[in-house]
Amino acid sequence: MKSRLIIITITIFCALMSFGQGEKSFLRTKDEISMKVRKYFAPSLDLPFVNEFYAKDLTVFINDLKIEGKENYLKRLQMIHDDFFKDIKMENLHVHTNYFSPEALTGDGKTMGEVNSEKQTIWSNAWGTFTGIGRVSGKKVSFRMHMDFRTKNGKVIEMLAYYDPAQMNAEIEAFKKVRLK
């Protein structure tokens, strides 16, 4: 009886240990990458920081709009701050960073290790409410936004942004009309 109990205990222990050996993905909120993403959303545009934040070969998707390269995205970002909006804030900001193991499944059933050559795939997720005042229209804008940042070697190499662009597009159109006069 005693040997049977020992065998059962060892079997359960081994099963639990092997269960824990699979995927090792984890999530953080106070890590260095999450804190950099938080800093990115500071009310004033810190160009030296943003320049270091993004990799040169950055790819950005804003809804279905694709922007290739850090230089091109930084031009757009600077226009948002300098030409389109003032008093920009990201209210109710939440940021967390996902550290995916190579065994983590992707949307098509492959593993992260099969899709990416990196040892670990890192995505930070951020969401909150973008607020600001249109520089041309004077209208207060407020819309929810979700953004994802893929980091490699300490720099963001891919960014995804999802939001309803109606208010931003209205301010861009107002800016274009004034500029054409």
Residue ranges and their predicted role:
Residues 1-26:
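Bacterial Sec-dependent N-terminal signal peptides
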Residues 21-181:
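C-terminal and inter-domain tail/linker signature
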